[in-house]
Each structure stands twice: as structure tokens, then as C-alpha cells.
């Protein structure tokens, strides 16, 4: 299956994302603590924790930092008194957007999210307004690799689909609870992924042009800058040509 991988669409944002690494680590640690608090400290028995561990390792977090966060969660750290909140809305160009938050204060969080939408030409929607457009999946990504080898190992391990892109990148899709098991099987076969994360995948795409793409990127950046926001998912599709101008 051909197409454009996320590597092409996100490469132009790498420098800005690297500058946010400190904030990213803070958010990952918060998720590790919360997941361990709610489901226990064993990643093999706690899919949410395993997903957080995989994300931490994909972002080059040290095992020591990771293990300390899990221990805090198991020990009942105050940071674990958080709830997961999902907000939905529409962004520039009619993009559908889902925002996953961890918060101990709903009023503060919704005010920050609403402010970002109002600043960037979007609208915060009601529950269910765009959720039906997304499916929760595990995504194991290889920036490059042998398609046949990865596909055979992935499908044998229980993956749902394997997609190869024009630039040589390969994504392995799994049920989100099975992502850790599939990644382990791939590594056992000598196939080390560049990243593994749980994501909300859109069933439809909204094409962004030179006018709407920068507005969408600004909205995503504003949302990601909110301390309570863990993840931002959207169905905006940015071509290589438009991405090169951002």
C-alpha cells in the first residue's frame, strides 16, 4: 500500500519538537505514574503502562527515569490523582481533532483547550462530535526496513496490518492492547522499530493547503503547549509540497 508516511509530514517539525523535549518528558512521566497507579507496575499485565513505557523508550527516556516514575505510581504519588479527559473539536480546513488530557482540574483544562481553539479558528465540540472518525490502535514504525521480513514477522505476531510508504517507511498496526507483544516479537526477530505508540487513527482525511496547513500547525502547537494535554490527534493531511513551505 503506497502513500505518504508520517515521517514526511512531521520531519519539518522535528527541530521544534526537540526543543520541547523537557515538556514531553514531563508528560510521559505523568502518564507512567497514572498508568501504574491505575493498573499496577507490571507492563506485561498493564497495556496502558506498556504503551507509556514504549513511548518513553521511543523518546530516549532512560530506564532509571522510567522506573522511578512507575515506582511513584505504584506507591500512590499525588501525581496519580489525575483523570483522563478527552476533548473533541474542529480545526482549520474542517479538520477533526481529538485532545487527550490528564488533569486534576477540569475547569482549568477546558479553559486552556477552548482558548487554543478560539485563537486558531477552530471550535471545541461536544462529546462524540468527531470520536466516531477515529480508532484507537498501536502503531509500530520503521523509518526504513525490508517490507517482506517485517510483514511476515508482524502478521505472525498478531498485527492487524502493515503499510509501506513511498519513502520506504513502514508502519505496523495492531490492536492497542497488543502493541507491546507485537513489538517484542519483532525485536526477537531482530527488527528494532524507530518508535511505538498508541494513536487514534482517522478513517477519513482532510487535505490541508498552503493557507490552512500553517493554521492547523499553530493550533496543534498551542494545544501541545498546554501542560494538561498529553496527545493531540487530527485527520489533517499535509502534502510534501505544502510541508516544505512550513
From Swiss-Prot:
Keywords: Cytoplasm, DNA-binding, Transcription, Transcription regulation
Gene3D superfamilies with a match to the protein in the record: 1.10.10.200, 3.30.70.980
Region of interest: Disordered: 1-20
Molecular function in Gene Ontology: DNA binding
Coiled-coil annotated spans: none
Domain of life: Bacteria
Pfam families: TACO1_YebC_N, Transcrip_reg
GO cellular component, one term: cytosol
InterPro entries per record: Integrase-like_N (IPR017856), TACO1_YebC-like_2nd/3rd_dom (IPR048300), TACO1_YebC_N (IPR049083), Transcrip_reg_TACO1-like (IPR002876), Transcrip_reg_TACO1-like_dom3 (IPR026564), YebC-like (IPR029072)
Localisation per UniProt entry: Cytoplasm
Cysteine pairs bridged by disulfides in the record: none
One of the GO biological process terms: regulation of DNA-templated transcription
Family the entry assigns: Belongs to the TACO1 family.
PANTHER family for this protein: TRANSCRIPTIONAL REGULATORY PROTEIN YEBC-RELATED, TRANSLATIONAL ACTIVATOR OF CYTOCHROME C OXIDASE 1
Listed name of the protein: Probable transcriptional regulatory protein YebC
Native source organism of the sequence: Shigella dysenteriae serotype 1 (strain Sd197)
Gene from which this protein is expressed: yebC
